[in-house]
């Protein structure tokens, strides 16, 4: 049986190493096949095509959406073209491959440019609104980056004697989009995995519109659906690092250990903290299909990485990972009139959802509720103002916080709460709130934002390092 493997954009930018470590490595003959690869755009390309993920700096899409002038988005699109052509020149030294790579991406960019120009012209008439078509434009632009890296991968593999074949899921010039699952199954029906190494685009054009729901998380959704639809033996995500017991930059590279084995429940907890091993919807697809997920370091191919399965539970209770997130605001709502009235929580939760604020956790007592939410300061302040307007008697306070968590497939460790509190106290860190559910999979400590780094190091030192796990907590 085959595997389905995903390679992220940062790894794809180190393409020669990816060829040597993942695509080919020491494999020969039949060992090269029975694999499907789902590849992302090269690092930075999607930022240029849409907008910068972290800074918000406008790319082609954002300039087009602002519609100030056609020149602005055209200039940005030409800038992307030059970056893509430069990447081609970096990858291919032979004239044939370079010409093929350039011809492919030039054709796609020309088509996109013509389409956007025509749409802008059409929307100059009052009967047509540009805003109604923007999501389609966003998806079309995103697909350029995915198609670029996938086409180049096939070209490079063929150059090295591998029978590689492109699965172009971008729907380019397709008459009408198919439903997502049908789009995947129809594309993969004709492949012979025993003789063909398949490279698929991370973006799938479909009737539902993946970006409507997942925005830039679409590649993992595509990856998971391919694994489920084709009955993969295993799904593998190649990252630039191991799934480790903590961030090595915070606790020291010599202190962290690879997790080795865990379950989808732990992956969900990590996702809730914004430290995604895999998108929760993708995990759900794999889990339902009974496909196990392996997280590997792209640049350590011989290492087994970490295997995530549905039923795994550590042999003895232990903490597997210390993780957290910094960008958390505590919205504290105090109102003595809320005693016994569940309507407060329902209405405020609805308001936060409308503002698209992500609630990591919440706690309450007799007359107060605190929501630990992630989002921009501007939106958080707006939420606080709207809550005050809705409940004039309430006192609403916003706190700058961080959440630090101890997570494990079986966290029923005797005295873990006492150890945690003692470790943070010894590090001079004040706990603002603490959460531990009956299921004993995660324990969250809420601390002041400036204490985040020290709290991660303190908990790793107290809860993981004394166990002397060696290189891996549980071998995959």
Swiss-Prot record:
Its EC number is 2.7.2.4. Its main location: cytoplasm. Keywords: Allosteric enzyme, ATP-binding, Cytoplasm, Kinase, Nucleotide-binding, Transferase. The keyword Hydrolase does not apply. Residues 405-476 form the ACT domain. It comes from the Bacteria. GO terms for molecular function: aspartate kinase activity; ATP binding. It is found in: Cytoplasm. It is an enzyme of class 2 (transferase). It catalyses: L-aspartate + ATP = 4-phospho-L-aspartate + ADP. Induction: Induced in response to osmotic stress. InterPro entries: AceGlu_kinase-like_sf, ACT-like_dom_sf, ACT_Aspartokinase, Asp/Glu/Uridylate_kinase. Pathway: Amine and polyamine biosynthesis; ectoine biosynthesis. One of its GO terms (cellular component) is cytosol. Allosterically and strongly feedback inhibited by tryptophan. The presence of either 650 mM NaCl or KCl reduces the inhibition by tryptophan. Gene3D superfamilies: Acetylglutamate kinase-like (3.40.1160.10), VC0802-like (3.30.2130.10). One of its GO terms (biological process) is homoserine biosynthetic process. It holds the Pfam family ACT_9. Belongs to the aspartokinase family. PANTHER family: ASPARTATE KINASE (PTHR21499), ASPARTOKINASE (PTHR21499:SF3). Monomer. Involved in the biosynthesis of L-aspartate-beta-semialdehyde, which is an intermediate in the biosynthesis of ectoine, a highly soluble organic osmolyte, called compatible solute. Ectoine is used to avoid excessive water efflux, plasmolysis, molecular crowding of the cytoplasm, and cessation of growth in high salinity environments. Catalyzes the phosphorylation of the beta-carboxyl group of L-aspartate to yield 4-phospho-L-aspartate. This is Aspartate kinase Ask_Ect. It comes from Stutzerimonas stutzeri (strain A1501). The gene is ask.
């Amino acid at each position: 049986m085959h595997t389905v493997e995903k390679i992220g954009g940062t790894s794809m930018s180190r393409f020669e190493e990816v060829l040597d470590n993942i695509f080919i490595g020491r494999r020969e003959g039949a060992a090269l096949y029975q694999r499907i690869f789902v590849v992302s755009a090269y690092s930075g390309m999607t930022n240029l095509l849409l907008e910068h993920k972290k800074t918000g700096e406008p790319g082609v899409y954002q300039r087009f959406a602002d519609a100030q002038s056609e020149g602005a988005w055209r200039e940005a699109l030409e800038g992307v073209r030059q970056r893509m052509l430069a990447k081609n020149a970096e990858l291919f030294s032979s004239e044939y491959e370079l010409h093929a790579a350039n011809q492919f991406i030039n054709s796609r960019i020309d088509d996109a440019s013509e389409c956007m120009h025509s749409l802008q012209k059409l929307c100059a008439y009052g009967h047509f609104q540009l805003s109604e078509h923007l999501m389609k434009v966003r998806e079309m632009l995103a697909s350029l980056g995915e198609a670029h890296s996938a086409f180049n991968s096939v070209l490079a593999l063929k150059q090295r004697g591998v029978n590689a074949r492109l699965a172009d899921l971008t729907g380019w010039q397709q008459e009408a989009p198919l439903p997502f699952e049908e789009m995947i199954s129809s594309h993969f029906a004709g492949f012979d995995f025993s003789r063909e190494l398949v490279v698929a685009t991370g973006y799938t054009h479909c009737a539902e519109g993946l970006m409507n729901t997942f925005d830039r998380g679409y590649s993992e959704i595509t990856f998971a659906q391919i694994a489920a639809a084709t009955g993969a033996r295993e799904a593998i995500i190649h990252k630039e690092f191991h799934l480790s017991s903590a961030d090595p930059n915070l606790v020291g590279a010599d202190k962290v250990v690879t997790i080795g084995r865990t379950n989808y429940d732990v992956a969900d907890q990590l996702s809730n903290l914004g430290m995604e091993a895999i998108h929760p919807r993708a995990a759900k697809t794999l889990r339902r299909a009974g496909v196990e997920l392996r997280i590997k370091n792209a640049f350590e191919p011989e290492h087994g990485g970490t295997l995530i399965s549905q039923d795994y539970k550590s042999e003895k209770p232990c903490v597997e990972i210390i993780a957290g997130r910094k960008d958390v605001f505590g919205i504290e709502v105090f109102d003595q009139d809320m005693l016994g009235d569940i309507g407060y929580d329902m209405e405020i939760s609805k308001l936060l959802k409308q503002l698209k604020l992500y609630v990591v956790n919440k706690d309450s007592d007799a007359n107060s509720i605190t929501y630990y939410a992630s989002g921009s300061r501007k939106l958080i302040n707006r939420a606080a103002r709207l809550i005050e307007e809705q409940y004039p008697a309430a006192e609403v306070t916003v706190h700058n916080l961080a959440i630090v968590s101890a997570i494990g497939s079986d966290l029923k460790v005797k005295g873990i709460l006492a150890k945690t509190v003692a470790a943070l106290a010894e590090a001079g860190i004040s706990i603002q709130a603490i959460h531990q559910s009956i299921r004993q999979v995660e324990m969250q400590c809420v601390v002041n934002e400036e204490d985040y780094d020290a709290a991660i190091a303190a908990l790793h030192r107290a809860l993981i390092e004394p166990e002397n796990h060696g290189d891996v907590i549980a071998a995959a």
